[in-house]
Amino acid sequence: GEELGATVRSADITEILISDLLEFVHQYSVPRYKLKNRSGKNNSQQGTDVIAYKYKNEDKTPNDKDELVAAEVKATLSNTEYIPIKNAIIDSRKDEHRLARSVNYCRKRLKELGKIEEVKRFLFKPDNNYRITYVAAGVSSRENVDDAIELDFSGEELEIRKNELIFYVHGKKLMELAHNIYQRCCK
């Protein structure tokens, strides 16, 4: 069959990386259904890149401290530029408009698995208030990070919302890692 192109491999691996960061480091639940609904192998699914959520109460009864996370992920694994951070911050603003559609898509996928209650609580914010956190995640193959990072923002591009986090994941030869992971998965 047709292999995934480098851009799609890069995007997929970085979305998985940010999903893992949210799930295993920050203890969020992260539905992993986005990659299963492509219109083509080299087409990215539209909507919020990564959705994650966390319940305040162990029994998952609604609490206004429950949290829904929308992460915008940008990557340039073949170079060492900081530009993915800037692009993620700018495009993260779009998640305010795409989030409801993306959560509804997750609900449909969870319904197929008999787990509809898992994310249903986050569909109707007016009924049960919760917090929304927007994450702008940039990933590149930079080995070391400078003490000061200048991103050349202008005007309202610079605005970082009160409920926004910025992640920058970097490491040497990340594109090589993405290709290696892809090859191992194909075997």
Roles of regions detected by a PLM:
Residues 53-70:
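Active-site beta-strand-loop-beta-strand hairpin of nuclease catalytic cores
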Residues 79-146:
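Acidic, metal/cofactor-coordinating or nucleic-acid-engaging core segments within structured domains
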Residues 119-187:
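Charged, structured surface patches that assemble and position nucleic-acid processing machinery
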Residues 24-43:
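A short acidic/basic microdomain associated with nuclease active sites
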Residues 22, 50-52, 69-75:
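Conserved catalytic cores of phosphodiester-cleaving nucleases, focusing on short active-site segments
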Residues 1-16:
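Interdomain/boundary linker segments immediately adjacent to catalytic/signaling cores
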Residues 32-37, 47-58:
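Active-site glycine-rich loop that binds ribose-phosphate moieties when present
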Residues 16-25:
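Amphipathic alpha-helical segments that form well-ordered structural scaffolds
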